C-alpha cells in the first residue's frame, strides 16, 4: 500500500499536468 502511494506521488510529481 505504501509503495503504491509512493509511486503515485512520484508519478504525480513527474506528471507534466502538475500545478507548476
Curated annotation (Swiss-Prot):
One Pfam family named in its UniProt record: Cyt_b-c1_8
Localization of this protein: Mitochondrion inner membrane
UniProt feature coiled coil, ranges: none
Lineage: superkingdom: Eukaryota
Membrane topology: Single-pass membrane protein
Cellular component, GO annotation: mitochondrial inner membrane; respiratory chain complex
Keywords: Electron transport, Membrane, Mitochondrion, Mitochondrion inner membrane, Respiratory chain, Transport
Subunit structure: Component of the ubiquinol-cytochrome c oxidoreductase (cytochrome b-c1 complex, complex III, CIII), a multisubunit enzyme composed of 3 respiratory subunits cytochrome b, cytochrome c1 and Rieske protein, 2 core protein subunits, and additional low-molecular weight protein subunits. The complex exists as an obligatory dimer and forms supercomplexes (SCs) in the inner mitochondrial membrane with cytochrome c oxidase (complex IV, CIV).
Function: Component of the ubiquinol-cytochrome c oxidoreductase, a multisubunit transmembrane complex that is part of the mitochondrial electron transport chain which drives oxidative phosphorylation.
Family: Belongs to the UQCRQ/QCR8 family.
Protein name: Cytochrome b-c1 complex subunit 8
Amino acid at each position: 500500500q505504501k509503495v503504491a502511494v509512493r509511486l503515485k506521488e512520484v508519478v504525480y510529481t513527474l506528471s507534466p499536468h502538475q500545478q507548476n
